[in-house]
């Protein structure tokens, strides 16, 4: 995570230097072109998701299997080959981390709030217990009080 932050800070500094040079040189047309192109690139997003996925799964290595236990057998969610998590799993990974607001999730996943809402609703419809599904997801990986007491 720290490595990722450092890399983005370095990119931001490079961009800031470039903008400073363009402003001093009066190259405002070039700056306007940069603002149209300087959006998050596909490779930046892919790298971000790979780092997020790997970090999250280090914290919660059994997340996918525990998550799927909350879904009907015919509705299991499995990432594609080469993926650690997919969009649905990332949404619920964020929920597990305490981020429940769809707008915040949308910002973090580069999606619209409506897309987040649609995914959440679709996955909730596949749950064994729809009413407590998100509460159960939020508890994935927690030690129960009973387990703690038995190990004491």
List PLM regions with ranges.
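Conserved HAMP-HisKA connector
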Residues: 1-6, 13
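Histidine phosphotransfer helical core of two-component systems
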Residues: 13-53, 74-79
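Cytosolic nucleotide-binding catalytic cores of signal-transduction proteins
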Residues: 46-152
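Phosphate/oxyanion-binding loops and surfaces in catalytic or ligand/nucleic-acid-binding neighborhoods
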Residues: 7, 18, 59
């Amino acid at each position: 995570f720290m490595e990722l932050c450092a890399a983005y800070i370095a990119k931001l500094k490079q961009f800031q230097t470039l903008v400073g040079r363009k402003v001093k040189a009066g190259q405002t047309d070039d700056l306007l072109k940069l603002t149209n192109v300087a959006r998050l690139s596909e490779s930046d997003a892919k790298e971000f998701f790979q780092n997020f996925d790997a970090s999250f799964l280090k914290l919660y290595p059994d997340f996918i299997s525990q998550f799927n236990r909350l879904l009907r057998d015919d509705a299991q969610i499995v990432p594609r080959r080469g993926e650690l998590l997919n969009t649905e799993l990332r949404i619920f990974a964020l929920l597990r981390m305490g981020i429940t607001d769809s707008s915040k999730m949308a910002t973090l996943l580069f999606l619209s709030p409506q897309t987040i809402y649609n995914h959440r609703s679709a996955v909730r419809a596949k749950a064994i217990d729809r009413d407590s599904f998100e509460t159960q997801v939020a508890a994935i990986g927690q030690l129960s009080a009973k387990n703690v007491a038995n190990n004491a």
